[in-house]
């Protein structure tokens, strides 16, 4: 594995952003009834995995995947709240807190 450099982190950030975009587009596609939004969602997922593949060249897979998934979920929750007026119940908030705590623990290990 190469040494961690800025561009590995940049690819990880890009992967998170593309995952969030994919999730938003998927919601907006209304179950692929709006085909072009569904196709854009799939292309965003492809881009996210491509960026993640570049990120893991310098970041351990377990760390990169945990950060990608965790930040993606947290940001998707925020986007759902802002764009679609979706709210978490208390169990959802507990799950999100546990997820974020788990990301911190993986990063510190």
Curated annotation (Swiss-Prot):
GO terms for molecular function: amino-acid betaine transmembrane transporter activity; antiporter activity; choline transmembrane transporter activity; spermidine transmembrane transporter activity. Keywords: Cell inner membrane, Cell membrane, Membrane, Transmembrane, Transmembrane helix, Transport. Gene3D superfamilies: 1.10.3730.20. It is a multi-pass membrane protein. Disulfide bonds: none annotated. The keyword Cell membrane applies. Its main location: membrane. Signal peptide: none annotated. The chain crosses the membrane at residues 6-26, 35-55, 64-84, 88-108. Pfam families: Multi_Drug_Res. The keyword Glycoprotein does not apply. It comes from the Bacteria. One of its GO terms (cellular component) is plasma membrane. One of its GO terms (biological process) is glycine betaine transport. It is found in: Cell inner membrane. Catalyzes the excretion of spermidine. Belongs to the drug/metabolite transporter (DMT) superfamily. Small multidrug resistance (SMR) (TC 2.A.7.1) family. MdtI subfamily. Forms a complex with MdtJ. This is Spermidine export protein MdtI. It comes from Yersinia enterocolitica serotype O:8 / biotype 1B (strain NCTC 13174 / 8081). The gene is mdtI.
């Amino acid at each position: 594995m190469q040494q961690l450099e800025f561009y590995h982190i940049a690819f990880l950030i890009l992967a998170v952003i593309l995952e969030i975009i994919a999730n938003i587009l998927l919601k907006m596609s209304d179950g692929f009834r709006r085909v072009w939004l569904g196709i854009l969602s799939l292309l965003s997922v492809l881009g996210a995995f491509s960026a993640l593949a570049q990120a893991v060249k310098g970041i351990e897979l377990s760390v990169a995947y945990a950060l990608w998934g965790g930040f993606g979920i947290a940001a998707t929750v925020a986007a759902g709240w802002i764009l679609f007026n979706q709210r978490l119940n208390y169990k959802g908030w507990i799950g999100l807190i546990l997820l974020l705590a788990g990301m911190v623990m993986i990063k510190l290990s």
